[in-house]
Amino acid sequence: MGMQISSEGVVVVELPDEPETTKELENIMRCVEDQDGCDVVLDFSNVTILTSKSLAPLMLLRGLLNTYGRRLVMCCINPATKGVFSVTALDAAFEIVEDKAAALALVEPHADRSDSP
């Protein structure tokens, strides 16, 4: 799919559907380590279902970001996948918002700071 790294230390990723989701989450963890920490926005637009195989790397990513004091925000999650988070009570463990704009607003609250004198 696509991974974009901004100059503000934000990685935005359009996750692929299963079975590639787990591999992409592992790639994101390597990227976070290479960046010495960054905020991550995961766009689930292309994910039709999330399997238990992807939940473990997702939790590991959240833990890694916590060690750096950074955020993981997930967006564009379809109802079936939201159901997986709800049933497993993981919806309380993650920041989940409706769309990418809302996710970016959480991790880039001062995106206009380059315009400041």
Where are these regions (language model features)?
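Amphipathic, Lys/Arg-enriched alpha-helical "gate/interface" segment within cytosolic domains
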Residues: M29-V32, V40-V41, K53-L55, L60-A105, ...
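STAS-typified acidic loop motif
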Residues: M1-R30, F44-I49
